[in-house]
């Protein structure tokens, strides 16, 4: 058993959830600081982003289905060992209610997309934002399949934004 799994197993669900939510708050705050330091703050940042609910929902749904299909394919093609993230995902979602899962995923999506797409990609470009996104998921760095998957997903999300179709950050 790895040290990471030992640490994870030693945490209560409450501690784990607090840690996960704090990491998302940290990403949002870093994004806010970067928006003010590198740009003109929230107002100009948000007005520079497109807001097209119809196309965003339609194309976002197609993108999500495609990503789920690729995810299923990855799980069929690669060994369980190459996809083991130390049990974090299973531990995080195992005890959550479906409503809590939806809420948590929305928080993660908002905070991470705010930092990496709305802020970092706007100022530093797609390659840097995508690599930083992949490295933030540091537990995947030693797992080439997972790291590559997250990097490709990040690039795909960045290209999605480049096409100017985004709902919110």
Name each model-derived stretch.
Residues 3-4, 30, 90-93:
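Short secondary-structure boundary micro-motifs
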Residues 32-36, 138:
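Membrane-embedded alpha-helical segments of multi-pass transporters/permeases
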């Amino acid at each position: 058993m790895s040290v990471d799994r030992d640490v994870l197993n030693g945490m209560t669900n409450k501690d784990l959830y607090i840690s996960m939510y704090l990491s998302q708050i940290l990403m949002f705050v870093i994004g806010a600081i970067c928006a003010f330091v590198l740009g003109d703050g929230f107002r100009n940042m948000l007005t520079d982003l497109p807001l097209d609910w119809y196309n965003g929902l339609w194309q976002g749904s197609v993108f999500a289905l495609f990503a789920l299909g690729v995810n299923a394919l990855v799980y069929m093609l690669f060994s369980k060992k190459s996809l083991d993230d130390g049990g974090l995902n299973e531990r995080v979602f195992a005890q959550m209610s479906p409503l809590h899962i939806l809420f948590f995923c929305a928080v993660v999506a908002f905070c991470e997309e705010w930092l990496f797409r709305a802020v970092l990609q706007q100022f530093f470009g797609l390659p840097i934002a995508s690599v930083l996104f992949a490295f933030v998921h540091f537990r995947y760095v030693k797992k080439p399949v997972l790291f590559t998957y997250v990097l490709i997903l990040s690039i795909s999300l960045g290209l999605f934004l480049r096409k100017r179709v985004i709902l919110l950050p």
